[in-house]
Amino acid sequence: MTTPSIAIAPSFADEHRRLVAELNNKLAAAALGGNERARKRHVSRGKLLPRERVDRLLDPGSPFLELAPLAAGGMYGDESPGAGIITGIGRVSGRQCVIVANDATVKGGTYYPMTVKKHLRAQEVALQNMLPCIYLVDSGGAFLPRQDEVFPDREHFGRIFYNQATMSAKGIPQVAAVLGSCTAGGAYVPAMSDEAVIVREQGTIFLGGPPLVKAATGEIVSAEELGGGDLHSRTSGVTDHLADDDEDALRIVRAIADTFGPCEPAQWDVRRSVEPKYPQAELYDVVPPDPRVPYDVHEVVVRIVDGSEFSEFKAKYGKTLVTAFARVHGHPVGIVANNGVLFSESALKGAHFIELCDKRKIPLLFLQNIAGFMVGRDYEAGGIAKHGAKMVTAVACARVPKLTVVIGGSYGAGNYSMCGRAYSPRFLWMWPNARISVMGGEQAASVLATVRGEQLSAAGTPWSPDEEEAFKAPIRAQYEDQGNPYYSTARLWDDGIIDPADTRTVVGLALSLCAHAPLDQVGYGVFRM
């Protein structure tokens, strides 16, 4: 086992603390949900606020790993904080469950495009990790002004119900509590659940609400008469339990969860957790906030892993990629961490290590800070494309759980080789200083300026340095905006932005969630030699 000597670099802590304070402010604002008027109206109807519902549902004192709390940020003005839905994983009656809770204080809980994406992402987490789903329903259905973005396509609203059906078929429990409106297609959430609860004189379920019924048939009927709790619990049979209020409904859901039975045994050996020898808050000191500034990634590893100890694989070979066996909160992990640009040797080492972890049922933790693969004539002649492809293939085919944390830059093909979103990591998080794009803004501006300059030169048109700079400036600005972690997390390119000092805790929680899902057989395609 290896513990490197620790030498803290000049402090970068002030900038990290500023970034974390900005993150916490954004999280607090999103957690409020709708505006004060909407929240007061919600409470005046005898309802608990959405986060109160989640808190009451969870086992007291247990953690809640929230997914994408800043989804939709800035995408629809201020209309949809958190995409109007709360998703995450928490313990209910002793069993880890995925929780999906509509926030009716945000546009009546209606589904914007990012609301659908966030709901589907939560179901994907449930399916990958074999976790029961609990839906706290209070939604007006699809947001009609954007119906073309939420209704017809494969990954739109209907996929929610497809997922419910297929997960139930796999033995993954589906439970719904109707705590408010459940309208139109949304009515299938309780109807397709294994068990459903509804609150008396508060919850309603109908495919067509009173206005639609009147328009279609001329019948005038109240929401309670059309689809209230008494109707569905006594007459239609759509729901199985009638609750008096939110508190009673959540009590019933907890009782249902108590019948789920135990989860599968862990797929790997879990030992006693040992705290690192070095405080996690020191990550603020050892990691430059600017991803372009080099540092030794070993300094990150020793502040995340148990006992600050790890066994490095091929330490003297391909040194721009650190590969190591370690433990986090008692769980084994194979760490793949960038320590510079990727060369052929780094990629071959990474592919070898990933295969080893896959064979040994060791989950993989990718720490991304990657500018990409080395470029140039000699490197192309040396086969860097085929060697990089080996690592990308290994990442794609590995059947063990993969977790990714973007701790700096995530650029170009380096994103692929380090298990970016397209490679289905079980979870992916970003630090507040992270950046993500096809290449850096300066590189993009230079490439496009070169192309433009050649076009002008061929036409015999002069191009002054000032004109070239004026051409480059908006490109840099675009990449700075779109490479920002808040731009990423708004679009669910990740599962959330986390405080660097919380990395060990978040990774440990995720490993505990991944541990009980059966693993597929190892299988790889052709590695081009």
From Swiss-Prot:
Record-given protein name: Biotin-dependent 3-methylcrotonyl-coenzyme A carboxylase beta1 subunit
Source organism, top-level taxon: Bacteria
Domain CoA carboxyltransferase N-terminal stretches: 16-272
Species assigned in the record: Mycobacterium tuberculosis (strain ATCC 25618 / H37Rv)
Family according to the record: Belongs to the AccD/PCCB family.
Keyword field: Transferase
A single BP term in Gene Ontology: L-leucine catabolic process
InterPro entries documented for this protein: AcCoA_carboxyl_beta, ClpP/crotonase-like_dom_sf, COA_CT_C, COA_CT_N, MCCB/AccD1-like
GO molecular-function term, one example from the UniProt record: transferase activity
Gene that this polypeptide is encoded by: accD1
SUPFAM superfamilies: ClpP/crotonase
Pathway per the UniProt entry: Amino-acid degradation; L-leucine degradation
